[in-house]
Curated annotation (Swiss-Prot):
Record's keyword annotation contains ATP-binding: no
Region named Spacer: 180-348
Entry keyword Nucleotidyltransferase: yes
Region entry Polymerase/reverse transcriptase domain (RT), spans: 349-692
Organism: Hepatitis B virus genotype A1 subtype adw (isolate Philippines/pFDW294/1988)
Sites marked Priming of reverse-transcription by covalently linking the first nucleotide of the (-)DNA: 65
Name of the protein this chain belongs to: Protein P
Function, in words: Multifunctional enzyme that converts the viral RNA genome into dsDNA in viral cytoplasmic capsids. This enzyme displays a DNA polymerase activity that can copy either DNA or RNA templates, and a ribonuclease H (RNase H) activity that cleaves the RNA strand of RNA-DNA heteroduplexes in a partially processive 3'- to 5'-endonucleasic mode. Neo-synthesized pregenomic RNA (pgRNA) are encapsidated together with the P protein, and reverse-transcribed inside the nucleocapsid.
Length: 845
């Protein structure tokens, strides 16, 4: 007989009106393969091969074939970034604050000071791929908005700018591992000896250099550890070669000034004397190139003097440029039409410099004039479409045979989070502004994380079919005017109102490397999680009567009363600011007693999903079609949403197993009215996940394939199955019987599958029912040899093993609570003691 919905409800024990047999008879029936097959057929769960066209959209969920078209906003504001500088001695500052750090805290802080990134191999892409043509209708607008965003990041000290093959410049405060260059000289900041001659010491820089003459550049080969010294002739590179910024040292022998002070006192002292003026003739440049600081091969193919003109002439490039600049070339030409760019270029007398240099120059490993990832802009988030966010695509490191396997780190699961945070504390959450950009990257990582652009001329040339620019050679003037068009002219005129003289600066090629960790690399979330968890660990030890917890950049503080929380907030904020961590005070949220964290609402009653997720699920069920095959890609999105809320339903994850099966088979899934009604009933009533309590286990379950046994206190029970069952199924049934007979929330078992509380591998009906019966039950592992229920399960009722005293302590998982936080009293004291709430009495860990 075909199964009716009522029958199905009866089987799932979800309906009290229909009479069900005793649990001991009903449950083993649910494990029957034949019954599960019939139910699957009745609910159309197994019929994966369908010939009707698939549905690719359900509500807001789209499949593989209909991705949402990104919307470009010409009014996007570039967010401002504070001058973020995380203090290098962060570990020492934490020690002053809380006393000696634990091993875990030290290790994590060392990991991010500085962060290192060495992929197995790096694929270099042409500069044209630097800014992605993500918005075909707004190409020029998107180009300038992105360039402005990159410029903002560079000014904020988040990016390096590649100056030559081996040097880069940046803004902001330098770190000790960033070796500075001054006019082509490497400067090592150490104590001065022999007058003011720099003394050779071993710098903690990019290069591990030999102790003999480490101040003079030798040839370096790149290795997995950045740059290693390579024995070879000294400074043999040809004069004028792009990439060598080092002044040539005229003495061929290697010297260290600490040993032989009479030698060449300053490295390349003639280099700075002979830094030639800007308008030297090409002949003199060639003749003196071994004395002047080396020429830089700019990405547009014209040699520029590096660091050789006085700052006063920085903005006066337009008066007598030495090299041909695509933008300024328009000034001296006849307009080719009403929409010629020369009209725009003649609007302004002084277009500013062609390139800007940072406040500091450092040496870097050899960096080609290429990019390793593309960038584009999107809305900052769904709620803030006024500001833009930069998306960096470094997916090459996660693909192919040379992909980097990113380190794994513990994400708190729902139960751990509830055990930890479900209490009657007052909560607030802190917003760390630009959290990723706090963590410094070693300059040796720069060649692997390059972004940039080939300049406006190449960008426009790629898009206009009538123009051909080969290898940066700007040929005749006719070629120059090939890029003039009405669309470009109108776009640039509008942008001129926004950016003014910077249009010229942004039209030049640029190559930038990351100085802080970028968001598009799998290493970054790991590093951020390590960083914030270590900081929270320090805060927890400094304020033992409070709770601080973090996941990525989401930091929450809890205290017993609102007044206490406010004083804690002040102290913690000051501490974080002293480390160089930037908080956004406008985004501090005070939650009262119900904390909103990681998509959950956590209170003293337990945890539930946040309201916007519940609304999304309701909306999703309203739009869900029945008897129509739904694309498995859409099912993936669906399962993602329903899976998040599954622990709050009666049947949990097992209820979604038919959907998982269709995704695995990459087949369409058809919802029958019955299955949809069953699921929607599950999700309309959500139950909180409660905090586990410590206790003493007094109920034990055990099973063999043929029978089960229970030990409830001093009482023993046993029974046999009608037919032999697989051992895991039998153990699960025994646990269900123990729960239903004793009502205990703490059960001892020797089966690892039951302990894991993942019931998705059992027959579908049994998995759903077991999840429903065992919801909120905690399990304790007891070895078979000590299990009091072992004998009854084998049919031996006469033998009594002594009842174990098995204490149970709820776990907070691996949620980075390195310093054990003292337990928080569960009641609010009548009067909070305010003698000194922030006094730190340090005790050894």
């Amino acid at each position: 007989m075909p199964l009716s919905y009522q029958h199905f409800r009866k089987l799932l024990l979800l309906d009290d009106e229909t009479e069900a047999g005793p649990l001991e008879e009903e449950l083993p029936r649910l494990a029957d393969a034949d019954l599960n097959r019939r139910v699957a057929e009745d609910l159309n769960l197994g019929n994966l091969n369908v010939s009707i066209p698939w549905t690719h959209k359900v509500g807001n969920f789209t499949g593989l074939y209909s991705s949402t078209v990104p919307i470009f906003n010409p009014e996007w504001q570039t967010p401002s970034f504070p001058k973020i500088h995380l203090h290098e001695d962060i570990a020492n500052r934490c020690q002053q604050f809380v006393g000696p750090l634990t091993v875990n805290e030290k290790r994590r802080l060392k990991l991010i000071m500085p962060a290192r990134f060495y992929p197995n191999s790096t694929k270099y892409l042409p500069l044209d791929k630097g800014i992605k043509t993500y918005y075909p209708d707004h190409v020029v607008n998107h180009y300038f908005q992105t360039r402005h965003y990159l410029h903002t990041l560079w000014k904020a000290g988040i990016l390096y700018k590649r100056e030559t093959t081996r040097s880069a410049s940046f803004c902001g405060s330098p770190y000790s591992w960033e070796q500075e260059l001054h006019h082509g000289r490497l400067v090592i900041k150490t104590s001065q000896r022999h007058g003011d001659e720099p003394f050779c010491s071993q710098p903690s820089g990019i290069l591990s250099r030999s102790s003999v003459g480490p101040c003079i550049r030798s040839q370096f080969k790149q290795s997995r550890l950045g740059l290693q010294p390579h024995q070879g002739p000294l400074a043999t590179s040809q004069p004028g070669r792009s990439g060598s910024i080092w002044a040539r040292v005229h003495s061929p022998t290697r010297r260290c000034f600490g040993v032989e002070p009479s030698g060449s006192g300053h490295i390349g002292h003639r280099a700075s004397d002979a830094s030639s003026c800007l308008h030297q003739s090409a002949v003199r440049k060639a003749a003196y190139s071994h004395l002047s600081t080396s020429k830089r091969q700019s990405s547009s193919g014209h040699a520029v003097e590096f660091h050789s003109f006085p700052p006063s002439s920085a903005r006066s490039q337009s008066q007598g440029p030495v090299f041909s600049c695509w933008w300024l070339q328009f000034r001296n030409t006849q307009p080719c039409s009403n929409y010629c760019l020369s009209h725009l270029v003649n609007l302004l007398e002084d277009w500013g410099p062609c390139t800007e240099h940072g406040e500091h120059h450092i040496r870097i490993p050899r960096t080609p004039a290429r990019v390793t990832g593309g960038v584009f802009l999107v809305d900052k988030n769904p709620h803030n479409t006024a500001e833009s966010r930069l998306v960096v695509d470094f997916s090459q490191f996660s693909r192919g045979s040379t992909r980097v396997s990113w380190p794994k780190f513990a994400v708190p699961n729902l139960q751990s989070l509830t055990n930890l945070l479900s209490s009657n504390l007052s909560w607030l959450s802190l917003d760390v502004s630009a959290a990723f950009y706090h963590i410094p990257l070693h300059p040796a990582a720069m060649p692997h994380l390059l972004i940039g652009s080939s300049g406006l001329s190449r960008y426009v040339a790629r898009l206009s079919s009538n123009s051909r620019i080969n290898n940066n050679q700007h040929g005749t003037l006719q070629n120059l005017h090939d890029s003039c068009s009405r669309q470009l002219y109108v776009s640039l005129m509008l942008l001129y109102k926004t950016y003014g003289w910077k249009l010229h600066l942004y039209s030049h090629p640029i190559i930038l490397g990351f100085r802080k960790i970028p968001m598009g690399v799998g290493l970054s979330p790991f590093l951020l999680a390590q960083f914030t968890s270590a900081i929270c660990s320090v805060v927890r030890r400094a304020f033992p009567h409070c709770l601080a917890f973090s996941y990525m950049d989401d930091v929450v503080l809890g205290a017993k009363s609102v007044q206490h929380l406010e004083s804690l907030y002040t102290a913690v904020t000051n501490f974080l600011l002293s480390l160089g961590i930037h908080l956004n005070p406008n985004k501090t949220k005070r939650w009262g007693y119900s904390l909103n964290f990681m998509g959950y609402v956590i209170g003293s009653w337990g945890t539930l999903p946040q309201d916007h997720i519940v609304q999304k699920i309701k909306h999703c069920f309203r739009k869900l079609p029945v008897n129509r095959p739904i694309d498995w890609k859409v099912c993936q999105r669906l399962v993602g949403l329903l899976g998040f809320a599954a622990p709050f339903t009666q049947c949990g994850y097992p209820a979604l197993m038919p959907l998982y099966a269709c995704i695995q088979a990459k087949q369409a899934f058809t919802f029958s009215p019955t299955y949809k009604a069953f699921l929607s009933k599950q999700y309309m009533n959500l139950y909180p996940v409660a905090r586990q309590r410590p206790g003493l286990c007094q109920v034990f379950a055990d099973a063999t394939p043929t029978g089960w046994g229970l030990a409830i206190g001093h009482q023993r029970m046993r029974e046999t199955f009608v037919a032999p069952l697989p051992i895991h199924t039998a153990e699960l049934l025994a646990a269900c019987f123990a729960r239903s007979r004793s009502g205990a929330k703490l059960i001892g078992t020797d089966n690892s599958v039951v302990l894991s509380q993942k019931y998705t591998s059992f027959p579908w009906l049994l998995g759903c029912t077991a999840n429903w019966i065992l919801r909120g039950t905690s399990f304790v592992y007891v070895p078979s040899a000590l299990n009091p229920a072992d004998d009854p399960s084998r049919g031996r009722l006469g033998l009594y093993r002594p009842l174990l005293r098995l204490p149970y302590r709820p776990t907070t998982g691996r949620t980075s609570l390195y310093a054990v936080s003292p337990s928080v009293p569960s009641h609010l004291p009548v009067r909070v003691h305010f003698a000194s709430p922030l006094h730190v009495a340090w005790r050894p860990p």
